[in-house]
């Protein structure tokens, strides 16, 4: 009888609901912080109850977070898991896909420990992010929930053409399946390949880029017909479309086509902003990456010479563009371009958003509810509400008083499971 009783006690412990006490929490929806509450998380990993005051912890798996600020799990809409940008001196001449996969596992764990429970991987060398997403979902690795585009789409010589910088005899001419497309027909083939691969969305590089080996960082690289084809094909498969764009003309073509988000947006002009507002297009600014590359451009030989002037110009401009877009009313979702700068420093984006004019609460919502809306999952994630998936983090200090405390994530729960305490 004692043995049977012990088994029931053990099973009861395994199925215990979780109770969190918080003296201050930000729910991702309200315009103000709330105080003195009990959050109950059910065995299904969802928020079961949010009660005023403090429920007795008896019978619960209990976490006392009254010395911290509690928030919804954070979301970063622009990451590249699988390595970080290195100087010319440090950079290996070749990184095999297998090594990239190993680095991606490390980066995913680092990102989760920073409080980011959901990320959007936009651009991959192969199948790394798709495989990592599945491995995390199965439980083989620890990391954030991943939504990924797989390989980016580019035109010949464009920002994401993986044969750039190689002699013609050193590569096989890239096919649409590899991500290099020219004309609507090839666009359809590439989108369908992403569907076959198991991607969640599409990422296109509609203009030049900073780190690619080309002189221009902002020229348009997709025709209107090509961008229209991307969006039409993506909608057929239920994909979102994220667009790398620095130059205004390229991003305007993308916005008119009906894409979901503009990434970077460095040289966005007033017309582009008005189009984004009219079309409900999100802006994912990645100020952190701009600041990082501008800083590194001052170091001799850090970048190839063709990259250096582009890097020097982009940093200050992205911050200025972000501030103007926010004041104008463009919808903004949090994104860092982590992988250009080190993983685990995603929190710095909050500091830059504040620096360039966005209030703390708005910045926190940009990384919770607004990101969830961009992904189309705001009915499941993005806020602390009953029935939502229990992605919960806590920081030491109050980010509404000092946004830099977002670097001090002390507690991480994803789908009701505690990963950091």
Task: Place the predicted regions along the sequence by residue.
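Histidine/acidic-residue-rich catalytic or RNA/ligand-binding cores of hydrolases
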Residues: 86-89, 158, 212-214, 251-257, ...
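Histidine-rich, glycine-flanked metal-binding segment
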Residues: 29-71
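Active-site gating loops and adjacent loop-to-helix segments of metal-dependent hydrolytic enzymes
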Residues: 83-100, 109-112, 156-175, 210-223, ...
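Active-site microenvironment of metallo-dependent hydrolases
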Residues: 1-10, 16-37, 41-43, 105-109, ...
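His/Asp/Glu-enriched, well-ordered alpha-helical/loop segment
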Residues: 236, 301, 305-306, 314-398
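Divalent metal-dependent hydrolysis catalytic cores, especially in the metallo-beta-lactamase
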Residues: 104-129, 142-152, 199-212, 240, ...
């Amino acid at each position: 009888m004692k043995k049977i009783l012990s088994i029931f006690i053990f099973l009861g412990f395994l199925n215990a609901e979780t109770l969190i006490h918080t003296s201050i929490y930000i729910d991702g929806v309200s315009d103000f912080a709330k105080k003195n509450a009990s959050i109950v998380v059910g065995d299904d990993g969802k928020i079961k109850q949010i009660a005023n005051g403090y429920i007795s912890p008896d019978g619960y798996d209990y976490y006392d977070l009254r010395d911290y600020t509690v928030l919804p799990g954070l979301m970063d809409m622009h990451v590249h898991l699988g390595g970080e940008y290195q100087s010319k001196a440090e950079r290996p001449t070749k990184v095999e896909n297998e090594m990239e996969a190993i680095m991606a596992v490390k980066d995913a764990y680092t990102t989760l420990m920073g409080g980011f429970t959901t990320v959007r991987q936009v651009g991959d060398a192969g199948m790394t992010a798709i495989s990592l997403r599945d491995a995390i979902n199965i439980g083989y690795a620890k990391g954030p929930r991943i939504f990924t585009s797989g390989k980016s789409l580019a035109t010949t010589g464009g920002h994401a053409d993986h044969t750039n910088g190689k002699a013609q005899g050193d590569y096989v001419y890239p096919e649409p399946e590899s991500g290099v497309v020219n004309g609507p027909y090839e666009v359809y083939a590439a989108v369908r390949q992403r569907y076959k691969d198991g991607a969640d969305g599409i990422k296109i590089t509609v203009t030049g880029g900073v780190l690619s080996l080309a002189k221009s960082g902002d020229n348009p690289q997709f025709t209107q017909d090509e961008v229209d084809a991307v969006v039409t094909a993506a909608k057929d498969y239920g994909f979102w479309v994220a667009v790398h764009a620095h130059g205004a003309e390229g991003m305007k073509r993308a916005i008119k086509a009906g894409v979901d988000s503009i990434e970077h947006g460095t040289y966005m002009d007033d017309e582009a902003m008005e189009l984004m507002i009219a079309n409900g297009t999100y802006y994912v600014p990645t100020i952190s990456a701009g600041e990082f590359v501008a800083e590194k451009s001052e170091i001799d030989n850090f970048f190839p010479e063709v990259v250096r002037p582009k890097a020097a110009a982009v940093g200050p401009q992205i911050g200025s563009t972000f501030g103007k877009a926010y004041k104008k009313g463009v919808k903004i979702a949090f994104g860092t371009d982590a992988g250009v700068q080190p993983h685990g420093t995603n929190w710095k984006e909050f500091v830059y958003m504040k620096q360039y004019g966005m209030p703390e609460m708005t910045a926190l919502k940009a990384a919770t509810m607004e990101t969830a809306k961009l992904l189309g999952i705001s009915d499941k994630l993005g806020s602390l509400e009953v029935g939502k998936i229990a992605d919960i983090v806590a920081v030491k200090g109050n980010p509404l008083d000092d946004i830099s405390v977002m670097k001090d994530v002390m507690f991480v729960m994803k789908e009701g499971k505690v990963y950091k305490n």
